[in-house]
Amino acid sequence: MKKVRIGVLGAYRGTSMINYCKRADHAEVVAICDKSPEALDAQRAAAEGLDIAFYERFDDFIEHNMDAVVLANYANEHAPFAIRCLKKGLHVFSEVLPVQNMKEAVELVEAVEESGLVYAYGENYCTCPRPMK
């Protein structure tokens, strides 16, 4: 089975997803982007020996060869960055909040429909039994 190549935007908030993908048989992290050099340095240290590219600029990150992007960045950036990813041909998994207003909601829905790609909104359920253990 071909692994899904995943890029993660948000090195701090995205740490759980990065760690999950490192262990998964069906996915691999191929790129990590964050504005913070310190956050990238921490992920570089944790990724020693793995073939992961690191970016400080989203414009460079989005050009990397990947299949999907996890948006674990600032909430006010989720819709604009999701739309850019979809237009680039990338599937999107977005953390909360997906949009800031109705205009962004309409633009995001239109981008998903036009692209035919998967957009997933990852609501956290911290009160579910498993996370509470």
Where are the language model's segments positioned?
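Oxidoreductase and adenylate-handling cofactor-binding alpha/beta cores
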Residues: 127-133
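Short acidic low-complexity segments
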Residues: 52-64
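Acidic-histidine catalytic/liganding microenvironments
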Residues: 23-26, 64, 128
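Local beta-strand N-terminus motif with an aromatic residue
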Residues: 29, 51, 66-69
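General small-molecule cofactor/ligand-binding pocket signal
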Residues: 30, 53-55, 120
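Beta-strand-loop-alpha-helix segment that lines the small-molecule cofactor/substrate pocket
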Residues: 67-68, 74, 79-127
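N-terminal Rossmann-like dinucleotide-binding module
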Residues: 1-49
